[in-house]
Amino acid sequence: MLSTAFITLVRSGRNQVKKRVLLSSILLQDHRQMTPACYCSISEPRCSRFDPDGSGQPATWDNFGIWDNRIDEPILLPPSIKYGKPIPKISLENVGCASLIGKRKENEDRFGFAQLTEEVLYFAVYDGHGGPAAADFCHTHMEKCVTDLLPREKDLETVLTLAFLEIDKAFSSYAHLSADASLLTSGTTATVALLRDGVELVVASVGDSRALLCRKGKPMKLTTDHTPERKDEKERIKKCGGFVAWNSLGQPHVNGRLAMTRSIGDLDLKASGVIAEPETTRIKLYHADDSFLVLTTDGINFMVNSQEICDFVNQCHDPKEAAHAVTEQAIQYGTEDNSTAVVVPFGAWGKYKNSEITFSFSRSFASSGRWA
């Protein structure tokens, strides 16, 4: 009996070896035919997300993770080869977005996302004030400005910094040539994220729109609000000749007018230190741990804290549902402002679904007014 079992085991092993040799041969042939722009479908055996190393063995929780609400995406071959691990392609079709007017007369929020090159994706939110002109200008021109800078500059933080400054300068020229004097007091926040090779995430921001990454179910803040409450920003405003005054709700404003210290536009406050130079953050994604990126405007941020945003999104089946859930939750919490969310799914989408949601009882129910 023992010898018979041993012979059966040996024969089984030989069959497995033959299968692996055949698979290796197929992989080698595919590798020779591969071009840098070629993306591999998950249905092909050479780079399945459930067989990342082509061994014929399914991935375990430790390798990548298998969960109920996962989004099956193709694998980006060149980055996967470069980094030595499977990098899922982020499909723009799966990006979720929603924008609600709230109790305002007009929705001054704008958002956008696009594939700029084979390697770089673009995501952005803009929250206008003093009319939608500045937000519209950014929405119309920022994408092209970034695209034009990419061939000349490899560092994405530098690309975004230059783009913000160029757009601000272009808007200034546009406003001064216009007969509409209201453009001189129109401004906008800007939070822009670039994703290169599905791994390198860079975020630039001015104002109080935010970006956060959900890693292992917890929020990782990628932006910091530019408000007069920040000591460094307040000192910078004073050094430039501006001042900070508080309104009846105890909210600080630059020159008694603007609730932020950095923005695109607001041309009448440039001499008082309101600048368009963004603060930037660079981070490397780990798709086994990172569920999504979410960009939000202050109609959400002043009502829903970062952990709540993570929890609400993690409860949803897909990013489109998640974006609507977050914006609608802000409305239910009593926000009066426009509310916009852009949700970008990553490799761990659905992995950290939590049956419990942590609520904050210290939320502010004051209007997030930009004007004193």
Curated annotation (Swiss-Prot):
One of its GO terms (cellular component) is mitochondrial matrix. Residues 94-346 form the PPM-type phosphatase domain. Mn(2+) 2 binds at residues 127, 298, 337. It is an enzyme of class 3 (hydrolase). Residues 46-61 are annotated as: Critical for association with the BCKDH complex. Coiled coil: none annotated. InterPro entries: PP2C, PP2C_BS, PPM-type-like_dom_sf, PPM-type_phosphatase-like_dom. One of its GO terms (biological process) is branched-chain amino acid catabolic process. The modification Phosphoserine is found at residue 248. Mn(2+) 1 binds at residues 127-128. It comes from the Eukaryota. Binds 2 Mn(2+) ions per subunit. Keywords: Hydrolase, Manganese, Metal-binding, Mitochondrion, Phosphoprotein, Protein phosphatase, Transit peptide. Its main location: mitochondrion. It is found in: Mitochondrion matrix. Belongs to the PP2C family. Serine/threonine-protein phosphatase component of macronutrients metabolism. Together with BCKDK serves as a metabolic regulatory node that coordinates branched-chain amino acids (BCAAs) and protein synthesis with glucose and lipid metabolism via two distinct phosphoprotein targets: BCKDHA/E1a subunit of the branched-chain alpha-ketoacid dehydrogenase (BCKDH) complex and ACLY, a lipogenic enzyme of Krebs cycle. This is Protein phosphatase Mn(2+)-dependent 1K. The lineage of its organism: Eukaryota, Metazoa, Chordata, Craniata, Vertebrata. The gene is Ppm1k.
